[in-house]
Regions:
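Short capping segments at the starts of secondary-structure elements
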Residues: 69-73
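Key DNA-contact positions within bacterial/archaeal DNA-binding proteins
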Residues: 58, 86
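Charged, amphipathic alpha-helical coiled-coil/dimerization segments
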Residues: 93-153
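Alpha-helical residues within the helix-turn-helix
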Residues: 51, 79, 96-97
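Short alpha-helical "packing" element that flanks the helix-turn-helix/winged-helix DNA-binding module
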Residues: 59-63
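N-terminal leader segment of winged-helix/HTH proteins
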Residues: 1-51
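Short, locally clustered residues in the helix-turn-helix/winged-helix DNA-binding domain
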Residues: 35, 39, 64-68, 129
Length: 168
């Protein structure tokens, strides 16, 4: 569903409203469905898996980036997660207050803040991520397994192309 209308209804209505415009309807369909799919999966995982651990999507992304790259500079977490440093600061304060991460100033450059998981944070991610992955598997359950590698490659290509446009 796309709001109260089905995807088919929405796409037909868009075609009817915008049919006279000289636009690339296939590009619009790909990007709008990519956006819808990403939001649907994110909302599902937030309501189910992440809610059980009292985590927002942003808090999960912070924990994920730290889990994979620790120790990691706070600016790298913001870049990897795609959110502002101000947003990151509030989320990290909450995660630190819950005993899931620690922040320390770099001994080489006092302006840099290094972030690591605590033992409690690592334990949470080790428990949470298999549950999260079950949700990921449910989200793609209706796709042909033999197409998943190609699909992932296509999504990577979209990401790389969009990211390369930032520099232009």
């Amino acid at each position: 569903m796309a709001g109260q209308h089905t995807l088919d209804e929405t796409e037909r209505q868009v075609q009817a409203r915008l049919g006279d415009l000289k636009i690339d309807f296939e590009a619009m369909a790909v990007t709008s469905n990519l956006f819808r799919a990403a939001n649907a999966v994110r909302n599902y995982l937030e309501r189910t898996v992440l809610a059980q651990h009292d985590l927002s999507w942003t808090a999960f992304v912070v924990l994920w980036v730290v889990w994979i790259w620790e120790p990691v500079e706070s600016r790298v977490i913001a870049e990897e997660g795609g959110f502002s440093k101000a947003t990151l600061t509030g989320v990290m304060q909450t995660l630190e207050g819950r005993g899931l991460i620690t922040r320390t100033r770099s001994s080489k450059d006092g302006r840099l803040v290094l972030v690591k998981l605590t033992a409690k944070g690592r334990k949470m991610m080790n428990q949470l991520f298999p549950e999260f992955n079950k949700g990921e598997r449910l989200a793609i359950a209706d796709l042909n397994r033999s197409d998943l590698g190609s699909f992932a490659d296509l999504l990577r290509a979209v990401t790389i192309t969009a990211d390369s446009q930032k520099a232009n």
